[in-house]
């Protein structure tokens, strides 16, 4: 009989109709008040050769009835014990639960399988190491709102009120919309803004929108919706920043719908280089050109990407009305990319930027700009002369022409191109400081002396003559005669007086004759 029972209980087949109740009981294939039971497929059973149930559904029913024999049979057919336990909990058949209690390591595993809130709570109560908050956490996790409703008064108790925040966050993380709404309507949430952070992190627009409903409904109930307008804008601006930072256009639009500031959204889009968001907002909101130009200044200030700058410039057809303002931002924030972009469109701001750089910036910044845009030394030096920036001229000219004589030569050439006298004098002063700082060859000094005479640089020429007389003496006769001739032709009396003094020295020393002097002097020097 044991072998037959074992065969019948472990195999899939149809029972003969001739088996009576007693035989079925002996075989262990009889279910009280239901009739015969046998396995017909891997996961199914048949009751009384008519009703087909899944093994786990049958376990649930057997558990509800507390029928340990049938449970044992169904477990033999690879059923899940958890269903029997759940059924037993539902009808409080604790004898069956006690029999299998040791086989359940963690009662929390059963919770997602339970639909009925009361059974859910009974199951959780079997986890003796857990507390009340643990029950609420799992109620949220498995969407059992009725359990939270049941314990509403406990949640309002000051002793556990501080746990509401963590429960709210858990509901948001698990996207339990009904529970989130209920918490918002019935409990005080210390930091409701957490819902927005979670919504953005999970890209859940529905949750994001629900956050506004919770916050504004709360303000409405408290009668502070209008009074809290300032706080409201702070919150909305923060949400705009979060949404744009993550590149979430729908979230930006949702915030704007609830009163967010379009200008703040545009500014954040520029600052975060969110070109697609920026493009959409400009087109859809009909942003005027003067606002776009202000956004361009912001883009320059934040050193935005080429794409962002190009987008903004394209909306104003690359025509900047307030060039001065743009140049200020380029220089003040060392952001020259916009200059490059405009140059590609045949709009040249190099001179304007260089002028402001020379006027307000450092030697290193100016040098960097000159190198970046391959600016000629003459252009830079003329601007620096106009702005009286002698230190920058000295520094950069030294970088360009390391040899002092070569440096003086090129600076002298630039002096010839400057049309206003004060500018020429300023650059000649710089040339003279170079002469004073280095030892030039005699021939270079002679060239410099002639240059000073041609430009009536009296003080510097006098300084040079003194040097020549002390170091070369009568060897400078030819130079003095040439300088006298130039000064006479250009009518530079001060220069003539200086030269005359040294010619007198030469004459006294017998190094020059009266005839040589007469070849140069005009009639006023006939006395010689």
Swiss-Prot record:
The residue intervals holding the ANK repeats read 54-83, 261-291
* Protein induction: Expressed in the early phase of the viral replicative cycle.
Tell me the InterPro entries matching this sequence: Ankyrin_rpt-contain_sf (IPR036770), MGF_505 (IPR004858)
Q: Name one GO cellular component term.
A: host cell cytoplasm
Main location as per UniProt: host cell
**Keyword Repeat tagged:** yes
The protein's matches in Pfam families, at most eight in alphabetical order, are given as: DUF249
One GO BP annotation of this record: symbiont-mediated suppression of host type I interferon-mediated signaling pathway
Organism domain of life: Viruses
User: Where in the cell does this protein reside?
Assistant: Host cytoplasm
Instruction: Supply the alphabetized keyword list.
Output: ANK repeat, Early protein, Host cytoplasm, Host-virus interaction, Inhibition of host innate immune response by virus, Inhibition of host interferon signaling pathway by virus, Inhibition of host JAK1 by virus, Interferon antiviral system evasion, Repeat, Viral immunoevasion
Assembly information from the UniProt record: Interacts with host STING1. Interacts with host JAK1; this interaction leads to JAK1 degradation. Interacts with host JAK2; this interaction leads to JAK2 degradation. Interacts with host RELA; this interaction inhibits NF-kappa-B promoter activity.
Q: Provide the function of this protein.
A: Plays a role in virus cell tropism, and may be required for efficient virus replication in macrophages. Interferes with host NF-kappa-B promoter activity mediated by TLR8. Mechanistically, inhibits the phosphorylation and subsequent nuclear translocation of host NF-kappa-B RELA subunit downstream of TLR8. Promotes the expression of the autophagy-related protein host ULK1 to degrade host STING and inhibit the interferon response. Also inhibits JAK1- and JAK2-mediated signaling and thus negatively regulates the IFN-gamma signaling.
Name the family the entry cites: Belongs to the asfivirus MGF 505 family.
Q: What is this protein called?
A: Protein MGF 505-7R
Query: Which species is the source of this protein?
Result: African swine fever virus (isolate Tick/Malawi/Lil 20-1/1983) (ASFV)
């Amino acid at each position: 009989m044991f072998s037959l029972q074992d065969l019948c209980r472990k195999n899939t087949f149809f029972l003969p109709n001739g088996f009576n109740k007693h035989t079925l009981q002996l075989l262990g294939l009889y279910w009280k008040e239901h009739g015969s039971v046998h396995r017909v497929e891997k996961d199914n059973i048949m009751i009384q050769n008519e009703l087909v149930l899944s093994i786990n559904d049958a376990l649930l029913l057997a558990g509800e009835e507390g029928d340990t024999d049938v449970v044992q049979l169904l477990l033999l057919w690879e059923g899940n014990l958890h269903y029997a336990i759940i059924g037993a909990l539902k009808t409080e058949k604790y004898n069956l639960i006690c029999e299998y209690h040791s086989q359940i390591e963690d009662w929390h595993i059963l919770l997602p399988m339970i639909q009925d809130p009361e059974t859910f709570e009974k199951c959780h109560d079997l986890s003796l190491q857990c507390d009340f908050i643990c029950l609420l956490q799992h109620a949220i996790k498995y969407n059992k709102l009725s359990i939270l409703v049941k314990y509403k008064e406990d949640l309002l108790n000051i002793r556990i009120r501080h746990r509401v925040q963590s429960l709210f966050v858990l509901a948001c993380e698990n996207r339990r919309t009904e529970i989130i709404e209920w918490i918002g309507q019935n409990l005080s949430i210390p930091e409701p803004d957490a819902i927005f952070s979670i919504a953005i992190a999970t890209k859940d627009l529905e949750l994001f929108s629900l956050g506004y409903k919770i916050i504004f409904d709360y303000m409405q109930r408290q009668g502070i919706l209008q009074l809290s307008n300032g706080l409201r804008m702070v919150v909305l601006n923060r949400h705009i920043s979060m949404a744009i930072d993550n590149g979430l256009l729908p979230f930006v639009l949702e915030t704007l719908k609830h009163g967010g500031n379009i200008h703040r959204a545009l500014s954040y889009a520029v600052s975060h280089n969110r070109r697609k968001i920026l493009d959409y907002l400009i087109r859809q909101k009909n942003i005027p050109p003067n606002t776009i130009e202000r956004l361009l200044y912001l883009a320059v200030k934040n050193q935005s990407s080429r794409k962002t700058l190009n987008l903004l410039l394209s909306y104003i057809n690359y025509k900047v009305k307030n060039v001065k303002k743009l140049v200020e931002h380029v220089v003040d924030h060392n952001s020259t990319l916009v200059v490059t972009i405009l140059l590609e469109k045949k709009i040249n701001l190099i001179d304007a930027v260089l002028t402001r750089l020379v006027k307000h910036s450092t030697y290193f910044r100016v040098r960097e700009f000159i190198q970046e845009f391959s600016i000629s030394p003459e252009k830079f030096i003329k601007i620096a002369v106009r702005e009286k920036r002698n230190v920058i001229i000295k520094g950069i000219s030294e970088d360009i022409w390391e040899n002092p004589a070569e440096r003086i030569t090129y600076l002298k050439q630039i002096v010839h191109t400057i049309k206003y006298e004060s500018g020429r004098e300023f650059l000649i002063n710089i040339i003279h400081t170079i002469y004073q700082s280095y030892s030039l060859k005699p021939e270079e000094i002679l060239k410099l002396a002639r240059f000073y005479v041609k430009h009536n640089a009296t003080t510097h020429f006098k300084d040079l003559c003194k040097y020549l007389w002390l170091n070369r003496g009568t060897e400078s006769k030819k130079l003095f005669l040439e300088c006298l001739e130039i000064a006479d032709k250009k009518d530079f009396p001060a220069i003539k007086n200086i030269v005359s003094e040294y010619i007198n020295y030469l004459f006294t020393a017998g190094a020059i004759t009266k005839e040589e002097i007469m070849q140069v002097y005009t009639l006023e020097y006939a006395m010689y």
